[in-house]
Amino acid sequence: MRGGELVALLAGALLVAGYSWAEQGEPRAVAALANADGTRPGLKPITGKRERAAAVRLISKVRVGEPGSMAGYHRERFGKKWTDAAKGVPYAGNGCRTRDDLLARDGTGVRYRRGSDCVVVAMTLADPYTGKKIEWRKREHYRVQVDHVVPLSYGWRMGASRWPQAKRVRIANDPLNLLPVSGAVNEAKGGAGPAEWLPPQRKIRCAYAVRFAQVAVKYDLAVTRADKIAMLRQCR
């Protein structure tokens, strides 16, 4: 039997058995520049000259501003946590919490609670920030957190404090601004911008800067001068 025929036969057997290559843990991440609405999984490193040049052009569009204070900030200013009621963003209104939507988007071998097609109880995550695989179970929920690429507290200081409530709810639940990652790494990031924090995995940093810029441009959100310089540096 030829190699190609064998691969096709094995692939067919897996499909009959109810599996896909993604469920077996194959990489699924796509490039940020090819994922403008955030509905495709993960972050793929940006390595080619053309892609890096496109990344620099995008980051160059981000406005620079001065940060304001944290006065008046609390999480509820951005709506109920993981609400399905955001307007104008993918997945909203599908009956599932935003967190579960994102776990299902980025996880492989996803398993749901019995009787539910929403509540994710197990999956394997290829963590874009560390490059490590995490075998996640809901009983250890803290091991995977959904990161706001542009932290909500950062957004508040950079202008979201003046936004209508509905716009804050959108950025808090927009899949473009959300990545399931290592819980410990997300805790270490906190509300920091790119000048203060970047993913430990160096090869993903340009892609991270692009995703940060995509969110900033979409919501017309300014970043600090230091953050813009740091973002550009990752892709040059």
Residue ranges of each PLM-predicted region?
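N-terminal module-boundary/linker segments of secreted carbohydrate-active enzymes
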Residues: 22-92, 96, 227
